[in-house]
Amino acid sequence: VFDFLNADGDSFRVTNAHTLYVDEKGFIYLSGAREVGAGFAILDPSIDPWQPQLIFNQNGDYMHEVHVWEDVLYGAELFNGVFSIWDIKDRKAPKRIADQRTAFTFTHSVWLDRKQKILYTADETNGALVEAWDVSDPYFIRKKDQFRVGFGADPYHIPHNVFHHQDHLYISWY
């Protein structure tokens, strides 16, 4: 799917996005899509899944990746070096409620442990950490733990993506 409808019903084309995410309610999120400002965009496929409607786009800061759960969006703002938390109960008017700087300030990926409300982040840079953040209260974010693989043997290991599934972390490194 390349063609979308804006709020006025006009068609436009998105040819490039870094990531696409679909939440539990079926909304589509584009991250790093130049045509919608390189932040994140929310699309509603409920009327026509072949031509979803753009209902919101945040076109300020570059958003490399998002993870959504229970009306909360967690965003990896790569160049700002933070993850941000957004209240998206009203998908047409999300509200940024918090952000947190990560250790190596190049926040590439975010993924939530849904049971414990722990957000895992990875900074895509040499020797960086995978960090675990308690986001149960977005107004009081606390770092719980961190992990680095093989740093003593090879300081050039770079964490790329981190995913949480069934009490395990799956991390790609290069």
Identify the function of each model-found stretch.
Residues 1-174:
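Feature marking well-ordered beta-strand scaffolds used for ligand recognition
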